[in-house]
Amino acid sequence: MQVQNNIASINAARNQGIETGKLKKSLEKLSSGFRIVRAGDDAAGLAISEGMRSRINSLNQAMRNIDDGIGLTNVGDGALTEVHSMLQRLKTLALKSANGTYDQSNRETLNMEKDQILEEIDRIGSTTKFGEISLFSRADANTNTQLWQPPELDDTIPLQIGGSAQAGEVLDVERYYIGSKELQLDQTNFSTVEKGQKSVEYIENAIEAVSKVRASFGAAYMHLDHTHNNLSVTSENMQAAESQIRDTNMAEEITKYTSSNIVLQSSNMMLTNANNLPQTILELLK
């Protein structure tokens, strides 16, 4: 029996320290919900997990961008729905003016309604916005006046619909500038039968032009909707994979915690007993 070095006590203290460390790690994992709390827990797993998290965050932001894009197409299509409705009314007026039964007073009334419709079309074209982005007009930065362009594709509104800057992850939504001039509706006149007949042609061309713009918005909407659904599934699957790598298996960790706790309590008891062993020497000396 040795007095200077209590080997049993030293061993018990060492084991107690080991189990205390294990218990702390288990508590960290159980309280945080993460299997990987620090890089030392699983360096490779942490690197993979962080890469996945970056991708997941990018996908989620891309879906928010797509939601904005869908909102933009809905705003544009909603405005053009009203333009279409007004063009249909305008065509009805033009067909009336092409009929020889209307006198000059009637034609003046038709022209007055036409002018009001054209003003409303111009108003929609100049004021329709998504946020601060004009969808159908462009304001000059120096003069704040409207610079109308032909009723054809002038430029695009880029939408980031992917999680990176790679090709194919940006959708360019076509933007058209629309107004009475672009649609050549300023050429319409109901003052005579001949002018009324010619006006019908202008209006039919305008209806076709607006239909093309709405079709463009519709195609963009479908593209965005399908992309959103695909990104949603991808994000969900990636989150599940990231969870498998990083999150705590609660059942397994509780088992480890319970085991370490039992061993720690045993170590405490053994350490107490080991520290009491030298007392037996005093008994021998009595």
Language-model regions, residue ranges each:
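Proline-poor, low-complexity alpha-helical tail modules
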Residues: 1-5, 9-12, 27, 232-286
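Amphipathic alpha-helical coiled-coil/heptad-repeat segments
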Residues: 1-9, 38, 50, 63, ...
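Parallel, heptad-repeat alpha-helical coiled-coil signal-transduction segments
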Residues: 15-24, 50-64, 264, 268
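Extended, amphipathic, non-transmembrane alpha-helical segments
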Residues: 19-28, 82-93, 230-240, 244
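Coiled-coil helix of the DHp
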Residues: 20, 49-52, 56-59, 73, ...
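Short amphipathic helix-turn modules centered on a small-residue break
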Residues: 33-51
